């Protein structure tokens, strides 16, 4: 039997079992754990498109028409992709049917090839995945919807689902992720029809009586946001959680930095063990000062942090005071406002935040877009943090010297499956699994986490790097991100979801509001616990010294040095 060298094989068909791939210019290396394209019986039955290649009539392409069944041809096939997801790092072909993932396995022509579970036919489009890493579309669960231009920026970074609140550049939206009231909720859902992005909105949860909160759930919010700027008192926390339990929606909390209405113990007590997403479980983003990190040790708090402090660098502290003053409508001329800002920014807790992510104690990663966070840097900063932690802390337990698969799965889960589980949308998005919405992001390994090559929404290309449209080929430089056909017309509204509450779906708000996007209801928001956070369920006993701000997890002091240089930076960007 003819053979081919490993390097030549990888260059032609992509890496296979045992091959390793470096992620961008980081110190992170992943290794292929399994190769589903070998189901035909081994090497030699790979499919590839192009002149003189396999996917031709009667060869790798069958005569079968497209259809809904497993023996029918799929609408699109991604060949020889390297999938990086929370469940594994595998080589596979991916079959897409309609807006969903139909199969992950071996593609080809079952009439002439053995072991085929993805049928290629005359009606099948091909995307060459050889040499590319494919991840699930990212989920940013902390969005201030301040301007619609955020959505294009996020999509170009590999984010395909944005959850948050706001109504545009209103003063309330600058500071809080709330879309308050039925009229504003309806208008934001109407606006969502214009964007190739899955969108869901939080209502305002700050109330001591339930009527106005129920009204927002019925109008279509996927959750309620408690924010200190509206008054996150124990009474408001209790009321909000009670309404959320009735409607099976999530609660997100930004707790009381000033400790005016209670301390962290009072907030924990007010929850009575009920689940909520703890936004700003971090070193400088807000919440009870200085010990909000204590909620990392509570089973009913689903912790996330935002990207401006991640990872901790020599520049982190300098930018934060001014940034905070702007975002929270503070005045540097007022001593109390300045003291408020400075109380939130603590180098010791910022340093601990990096380590808590690496330990899997902080479960999710988000942006806090234009409100002390950068909407296009969720994926980027997540992997920069993983790199920094490997350099400073070494290998994670369970990872051998050869690769960092365990760390890679932990970090990819922070912006994919875990926010999906926490917010009740994991039945639709958050991972590359059969039956889920086909939101896929394609990366050249050298640009992984920095600049995706292609972004698919609902099985159709919505954004891609593209050169001069008047050129004779599609690749002349300079290239930049441009919306593709999946971002226009009916393809846009078929390819993306608007998430709403179960009550809103039952009352047919889509018809009432005149919506065109398909609606999907969030579910199982109230039963999820920290233990359900994939690869990020560590529940340490937390201590934060109120005088020194030192942080300990299970007695271990958490401290690290700020980075003086990072990968995924000036090598890739002019500005």
From Swiss-Prot:
GO biological process: urea catabolic process
GO cellular component, one term: cytoplasm
Cofactor note: Binds 2 nickel ions per subunit.
Active-site residues annotated for this sequence: 328 (proton donor)
Modified sites of kind N6-carboxylysine: 225
Subcellular location: Cytoplasm
Residues where substrate binds: 227
Pathway assigned in UniProt: Nitrogen metabolism; urea degradation; CO(2) and NH(3) from urea (urease route): step 1/1
Post-translational modification note: Carboxylation allows a single lysine to coordinate two nickel ions.
Keywords attached to this entry: Cytoplasm, Hydrolase, Metal-binding, Nickel
Domain of life where this protein originates: Bacteria
Urease domain: residues covered: 137-575
Binding site for Ni(2+) 2: 225, 254, 280
Major localization listed first in the record, in broad terms: cytoplasm
Binding site for Ni(2+) 1: 142, 144, 225, 368
One MF term in the entry's GO annotations: nickel cation binding
Reaction(s) the record says it catalyses: urea + 2 H2O + H(+) = hydrogencarbonate + 2 NH4(+)
The enzyme's E.C. designation: 3.5.1.5
Similarity comment text for this entry: Belongs to the metallo-dependent hydrolases superfamily. Urease alpha subunit family.
Subunit structure: Heterotrimer of UreA (gamma), UreB (beta) and UreC (alpha) subunits. Three heterotrimers associate to form the active enzyme.
Protein name: Urease subunit alpha
